[in-house]
Amino acid sequence: MIIERWEVKLSKCNQNVGGYSVLSGNLKENIKLGRRAQKYLKELRNLQLKPLKIGGYENCGTINGEEYFLEVIHITSGRQKIDVAVGKTWNVTNIENDNKEELQYELFKEKLKVGKQDMLFFSWMKSLSVQLNAPLHQKMTEHGLADDNTRLEWFNIPLLRRSQYRKKVPYPSLRQMSSVLEVQCSTLTEEKLNFCVGFSDKPLSEWKPQIFEQTYNRYRLQRISPEKSFKYKSRCSKYNFKTSSQSWVVKVPEHDQQLNTFEKRYDELFDAQFNKLEFFKIRMKKLKKNKPIEKKNYKIWCLEKEDLKDLVWDPLKRICNHSRYAIFEHVTINREAYSIKPLRLTFQKLDSGSLDLIDNQKKTFGSIKLAMSMPDVKKTENQSIEESERHDETAIETQEFDENDCLSSKADINTSLAPQKRSFIDNELMSMLVTKKKIKKDKDVSDTGISSTSYLINSGTYANSHIEIPTSNSVYNGKEDCSFNNYSVKHSILEEDIENKCIAVNENKVIENQKVIQSLCKNSHLDLIEQSYFGECDFIINHSTCVYKIQASRFMQLRNNGSLHYDKAVNDLLTEFQRVIIIVEFSEIIQDVDPDLFWKIKLYLLNSRVDVFFIHETTDFFIDWMKYFIARWAFSYNDEKEKNIANADILLDLGFNILLVRKIFQTYSLEEFFMAIIKEESKAVKMLTVSQMTRLKKLLTLEW
């Protein structure tokens, strides 16, 4: 790679100008003067002096005006903003030439430092008018100057013109509106009492003189002469009496007046005809601000635009005026070549026999070493032969029993025969065991009668009437009575129906359902996943079905906001699942005390997406129902398709359950699923609820 560099030779600085060779205008900078210097500058205002020589004063010598360059500034206040314009510059004339030819040279203005000699010069100029016969500020004619040996001409000291003051625009004076409230508050209420005497009905013993003593000083009483009526005017009477109704004024004290005004304001507040604008007409006292601290504001010299243009330093201005050929003659361009060395990327060595894992919750890392073992072919063949023979024997034996005993016999035989084990029971012994179990079961039913659960379920209070026939490989016959007695459910589900099925359990309720989880995973290869789900469900059967266990005793309880105890939890589950299975646990006491509670619960939960089941408060019944739900609605997921799951955390953060995420990634990748939602394909839309669709569409409409 080649880079071209442009080298510019620096021009030599002019020492006479102090290095400012490019500047062609005047340089003006700030000068700080004391009070005396400012006083002398005021007196030298409008003066023009030339190099002069005064006879009789040898000590003074000659004074050359070229050594001094003065400018007078009008003193202004710090808060006043003015624009100062520079007048004509002063011209120094030659003494020898009478033609008054002006000296032509460049004038450069720099800082002026006033020292002791300058102060002596200013004091001498002050006393100069006394030594001369004429004052300096008077204009002298050429004839007077010719007669005198000393020719006095004036230095032209430029003045900074002061611009006009900026007038402050006064604020608009608005008239204050007359306020009724203000007038009432400013005036005191006065009352007049006629000359009359009143007596109280109370006895003298109840009269308290303390009240009169406390209020005596607040009133000013005047003596009133009694009214007299004369029928005739006596001649000897010295006074003439005029009859008139007399009264005295009683002023209400201040505190009473305030109470009176507040009572009036209270009446006006609740008066519909009172205008609200009266409250805005009341005058408010202005707050007195503290005086600001006076700061020393330094005076700034303001220059005109023409003078500022001369001060602009543009070194390339002259170069642009020249041609390219003239520029490249004096300018050299150097070429430099360099190369970039690429960095070597180093990667960590990965072992082929290990798998690195990251725990998102605990924020820990770990690795697993993988190894593969070859199975023994002979053992697998023998096991498959034994299992096939065992299934054939059980199938032949079960065909000999009656159809009524088919359900119980097959369940008992299959549960007793554990996998990978032999049975040493003969056919005769097996038939004897079956008959004994049948007799024992009939006795138990005849003694106890119909159970409470079966009575409620048979009477129609157990759930919504729509019940599907299971399509699994269980021994349950769909043509039989669908009363769903607890005992019939217990014997209708086999362990084989739960094999390789996958469900999810809510991590927040693992401790509560610990016994149920242990019994489900004890004798079956059930794939159970824990998920910290935000809902109140206990188990998730598939991507659209969940199980929620509630207590019948708490159903009618009310919360602080007036809703039922389980109202919010059921509504939240309906927004996330297409089917919600609610298992209501009840006790025998509730059945006897409040039998109407069951149809109330059923009536409240009457919904096409809700299935309700009533069971006793025992874990065994709940386990049997869970086996039935797993065998009926749970699915088995393929591990090979699950390897394609990537970025599953995106859907989990949206509130999707883990089984729904698995269902989505079985048919789509993440990008394909988003495209299917945008196109609103029916297959993808059926998986989600309305709430899940809205959340997903909000995610797809985000912009970065």
Swiss-Prot record:
Its main location: nucleus. It is found in: Nucleus; Chromosome. Keywords: Cell cycle, Chromosomal rearrangement, Chromosome, Chromosome partition, DNA-binding, Meiosis, Nucleotide-binding, Nucleus. GO terms for biological process: homologous chromosome pairing at meiosis; homologous recombination; positive regulation of protein sumoylation; protein sumoylation; reciprocal meiotic recombination; regulation of synaptonemal complex assembly; synaptonemal complex assembly. It comes from the Eukaryota. The keyword DNA damage does not apply. Induction: During meiosis. GO terms for cellular component: condensed nuclear chromosome; mitochondrion; synapsis initiation complex; synaptonemal complex. GO terms for molecular function: DNA secondary structure binding; nucleotide binding. Interacts with ZIP3. Required for initiation of meiotic chromosome synapsis. Involved in synaptonemal complex formation, a structure that tethers a pair of homologous chromosomes along their lengths and plays a central role in recombination and homolog segregation during meiosis. Required for the normal localization of MSH4 to chromosomes. Belongs to the ZIP2 family. This is Protein ZIP2. The lineage of its organism: Eukaryota, Fungi, Dikarya, Ascomycota, Saccharomycotina. The gene is ZIP2.
